[in-house]
Every structure is written in C-alpha cells, then in structure tokens.
C-alpha cells in the first residue's frame, strides 16, 4: 500500500500524450513503481487499451474511477482478465461527481454513501488495493460544525461498510474546487 503518486492531469482527460508519458518517466529519475495513472486520462479508451498504454509506459498501476467504470459499462470479468495479463496494481477512486458526504440534504448524503458502497463493492470485485473517497464539502458557508458532524457520521457508516466488505478506504485531501 505504498502509493506515493497518482497522476491526474485534468487538461488531458481524453488521452495521455506520448510526450507527457515520456517526460514523466525520464525526469528526475522517478521510480515508476510508485506511480499510478488515473483512468480518467483514458476516458474514451476500452479496458484493453487502458491497460496496454499504462503498462507500455512503465507505470505500476491504474487508479480506476468507479464513475468511469459504471458510465462506460466496463465489464468486471474483462478487467480481471486484463489484470491477470498485465502486472499492474489497481486502486479504485469512489464515485464523487454530484455527491456530497457532508450534505445538509439527507437524501443527497444517503445517496452519496450508497455510491461509495457501490464503488467499494467494485473495488472488492476487482481485488483493488484500496478505495479513495472524497470527503464532501459544506453545503452553506459558515456551517462548518454542522458539516463536519454530518461528514463524521457518513465516514463512520463508510468505515462499517469497509469492515464488512473488506476494502481499505483512504480519504483524499482536496484542494478548494467548487462543489468538490
């Protein structure tokens, strides 16, 4: 569980230019065994192409976004087949778009937890190292205490799910992005 870098270049969400891959590999003697590629960089790729590009460029694994897996209709058995062919590790990034674990709206908060659970089940099926979760955000400015309490409640539920399903969870430290 020694992931030190996960590459995610939002400006290149549809492809990874070869020059970027080569630059990352060559600069400063980076240890490629510590670098995973975010699957969103290869949004339009099929699973085989995704595995092939990540492997061919010397990376150690894929940070698979559950939202992408579900939206693109990827197949679990196909993923496992490719995982057996390519020596790449997998970690899963939980669904996070349009969700908020700290929402004042109970329905949104409950659906957010359900989406994390679906992501966690996917991570278990894919034998992923862990599941990364976004912490949510304040619905209204100035309601920090209430938001923190709601987030704590959500994370306690996620912790119980983690114990039951058997997938480790990491909480991602977020930069300030509206609605993230």
Kindly give the residue locations of the regions a language model identified.
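N-terminal pre-domain/capping segments
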Residues: 4, 8, 15, 22-124
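A generic alpha-helix propensity feature with a strong bias for hydrophobic helices
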Residues: 13, 20, 25-26, 138, ...
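Active-site acidic/histidine proton-transfer and metal-coordination neighborhood
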Residues: 105-180
């Amino acid at each position: 569980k020694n992931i030190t870098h996960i590459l995610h270049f939002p400006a290149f969400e549809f492809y990874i230019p070869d020059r970027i891959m080569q630059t990352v590999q060559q600069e400063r003697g980076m240890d490629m065994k510590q670098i995973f590629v975010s699957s969103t960089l290869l949004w339009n790729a099929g699973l085989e192409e995704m595995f092939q590009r990540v492997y061919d460029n010397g990376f150690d694994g894929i940070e698979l976004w559950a939202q992408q897996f579900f939206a693109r209709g990827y197949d679990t058995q196909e993923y496992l087949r490719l995982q057996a062919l390519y020596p790449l590790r997998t970690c899963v990034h939980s669904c996070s778009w349009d969700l908020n674990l700290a929402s004042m709206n109970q329905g949104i908060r409950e659906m957010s937890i359900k989406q994390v659970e679906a992501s966690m089940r996917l991570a278990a099926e894919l034998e992923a190292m862990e599941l990364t979760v976004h912490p949510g955000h304040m619905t209204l400015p100035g309601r920090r205490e209430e938001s923190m309490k709601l987030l704590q409640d959500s994370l306690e539920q996620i912790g119980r799910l983690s114990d039951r399903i058997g997938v480790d969870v990491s909480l991602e430290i977020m930069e300030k992005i509206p609605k993230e």
